[in-house]
Amino acid sequence: MIDEFAKEYLHGDLRWIREAMVWKLDGLSEYDVRRPLTPTGTNLLGLIKHLTTTEAWYLGEIFGRPFPEPVPRWDGDEAALSANMWATEDESRAEIIGRYRRVWAHSDATIDALAIDAPGHVPWWPRPDVKLFNVLVHVLTETTRHAGHADILREQLDGATGVSAGDSDELGRDAAFWESRRAEIERAARAADTANTAEGAGAVKP
């Protein structure tokens, strides 16, 4: 009974964070969903591509249930892995998000069909023999981590935060409130830095 509860709980969280991840692209231009927003090139549509490959492998191939569409291999092909993190001009947003949703359906079928202790094999892990529980936790963690990245990227673009439409202004706080909050945090950070510098300068050297 507890095993079934654990599987349903983890699966429910995965479904929720997937939708939040896709929502991060809503309302943005083609340029904004694709453009690099960090020095290493992190971008919103690339995160979707990466998570598609993650689920296709971990909740498909690992349990002998391969996703029927081509996905990049994780066998040391750096070029393929790099291409998995961004979208070319020939790849449409609808195509990439559509494939992600199809992977969801494939993953959901795997989760529904297998017991939480069903065995799998992840050859690139130090302990390659795993259970569905290990892999489900890993995929949930990976998706949540990248949803956090997406949250920051989206806020940088247009100030939108949260996990669904309306979250950004649900507390009734406007831009002036957040600018005041940011200024207060900046003031505190500078004050702490100044105090630390002064303390260091006044320290007696041995």
Task: Show which residues each predicted segment covers.
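Intrinsically disordered, low-complexity terminal tails and inter-domain linkers enriched
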Residues: T194-V204
